[in-house]
Every structure is written in structure tokens, then in C-alpha cells.
Amino acid sequence: MASTVSAANLKVKIIEEVILNGKDQGGTTELTIGSITNVVKRIVNIGTDEIGLLGFGTAYNTELSKTYLAGQFDEDTVRYIRITNLDDTNHIALILKNENNDEFGVKVDKGCSFIYGVDLDGGVVDTMVSADAAGITPDSFGDLVDITCAANTAACDVEVFVAST
């Protein structure tokens, strides 16, 4: 059966609104990402123990040793990732890991979002590295394979939005 889903554009708009001393200091940034054919939008409940949130691998990868609350995705086709902490009290911690077992963490405070900067032509391939400043070069990035998450004090609802080609 042939797909009846037509590719579409994802329009991402970030708006800052602030007036200081009577002058508008805000700004708007827009990005259009073409050829989107798949969108996953989920709200998941994250406890205080670290748990798999998103997984990435090659299309032929059958490694399913880990469970991911929001799903597993083909690393080559992901074009946009947004993770929003919907809680009004607690922060969450995101831990991102690449194929070289490099990890880095990001605190996402109550009501805040984290947008992962994918490669608009190559997905999450060669987009993540963690090392001291002297160890990072333009060619040292590895494939993002894993995003795990934990809440700091009490469970938090987290919205995950992933768009793919």
C-alpha cells in the first residue's frame, strides 16, 4: 500500500517580547524545515529515576535493549527535536549520549524548553560531542544515540515533539 501522506513544511518560530525603557528589544526568528512526513508529539510522565526518553539509530538497527518513553527514531531522518518541561514547580535533567559514550547534561527548568540542533540534511548523525574545550574540533562529533531524563524532586510531565522526513 502506497503512503497517502504528503510531505509538508514545519515552521518553527521563536518570539521574544520585552520592552525596556520604552523600547522594544524583542525579536523573532523563523526556520522552515521541508519534506516532513512524520511527527511524534507525546506527553510523558518522568519520575526521579533516570529513564530513556528518545533513542536514535540507523534504519536497520534492531538493538532494542532499552525502552524509550517517547520512541526510537532513524538517526538520518530526524529534523527537529523539542523537549518541554510542563511542570510548574520542578526542573528536569536531560542526559544526551553519543555513539562514543560521550555524555552531557542539560537542566530544563519549570515551563522551559530544550531544542536540539540537528543537522538539517543528516539528522542527528555527527551532531554531539562532550570533551574539554581543547578536545572539540569540527570533525570530532558523534551520532546522538540516546536522550534520557529524570525529574529533580517529584514527577514531571514532559512534552516531546520530533519531526522527521
Residue ranges and their predicted role:
Residues A2-T165:
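Surface-exposed, low-hydrophobicity beta-strand/loop segments enriched in small/polar/acidic residues
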